[in-house]
C-alpha cells in the first residue's frame, strides 16, 4: 500500500512539477482533487464573459478534467499494485493533460474578478513597478499578451510569469493543458488566460482577439500582486 499511495500522491507532481495541491483522499489512500468553488456568481463577469460560458466552463469542462484526473490516479494506483510498468507509463499522458487542466483552471478562476469588486483595476505596488521595469508599461504588457494569445495556434494558455531565479517577469505560452511549470521549474504563474475555444466561442465566435481585449476588464490584479509578493518574500 505504501508504494501505491506514494505513486498516487506523486503522480501529478511527476507530470506537472509539483504544481497541484491535493484536496481529498479516497478510501484506498489515492490522493485526488476536487472542483473548486468560484468566489463569484457565473454571471458576475458579464459583459466581458457571459454567465453561460462561465457555467459551462466551470461545471462541464473543468469538472471533466477533475473527474478524468482522479480516474487516471486510481488506474495508476492499480497499475503500480500489479507492477504493470507499461500501464504506469501510458497513464502519464492522461495525468498530465487532465491534471494540467485542473491546475490551469484553478488559477484562471482566481485571476478573474467582477468589476464591482475591483476587477480590471490596473496593478499597483511592487507588481506594477515590476511590469513597468520589465515591459516598459502596463499597456505594453497587455499588448504583448494579447498578441501572444491571438497568435497561439490551436488551444492553449498565455501566461504572465515570474521567473524566481532572475526575479524577472515574462510572457509565456503553453499548448493544450500544459501547465506553466512545463516551461521551467522556476516559473510561477501570476496570471493565465485560457485561449481554448470553450473559453470564448459561445460569445465571441472565432474572434479570439475580441475576447482577449475584453477579459482585461475583469482581471484580478490584486491576486496576481499577492502571489508576486509572496514568492519574493
Curated annotation (Swiss-Prot):
Protein's GO biological process: response to abscisic acid; response to osmotic stress
Residues involved in Mn(2+) binding: 57, 105, 194, 198
Record-level GO cellular component terms: mitochondrial matrix; mitochondrion
Top-rank taxon: Eukaryota
InterPro entries named among the record's database cross-references: Fe/Mn_Superoxide_Dismutase, Mn/Fe_SOD, Mn/Fe_SOD_BS, Mn/Fe_SOD_C, Mn/Fe_SOD_N, Mn/Fe_SOD_N_sf, SOD_C_sf
EC nos: 1.15.1.1
GO molecular function, one term: manganese ion binding
Transit peptide: 1-29
Enzyme class: oxidoreductase
Manner of cofactor binding, per the entry note: Binds 1 Mn(2+) ion per subunit.
Keyword tags: Manganese, Metal-binding, Mitochondrion, Oxidoreductase, Transit peptide
Pfam families: Sod_Fe_C, Sod_Fe_N
Cellular compartment(s): Mitochondrion matrix
Catalytic activity: 2 superoxide + 2 H(+) = H2O2 + O2
Cofactor(s) essential for the protein: Mn(2+)
Protein function: Destroys superoxide anion radicals which are normally produced within the cells and which are toxic to biological systems.
Protein family (similarity comment): Belongs to the iron/manganese superoxide dismutase family.
Subunit structure as annotated in this protein's UniProt entry: Homotetramer.
PANTHER family: SUPEROXIDE DISMUTASE 2 (PTHR11404), SUPEROXIDE DISMUTASE [MN], MITOCHONDRIAL (PTHR11404:SF6)
Official protein name in the record: Superoxide dismutase [Mn] 3.4, mitochondrial
Organism annotation: Zea mays
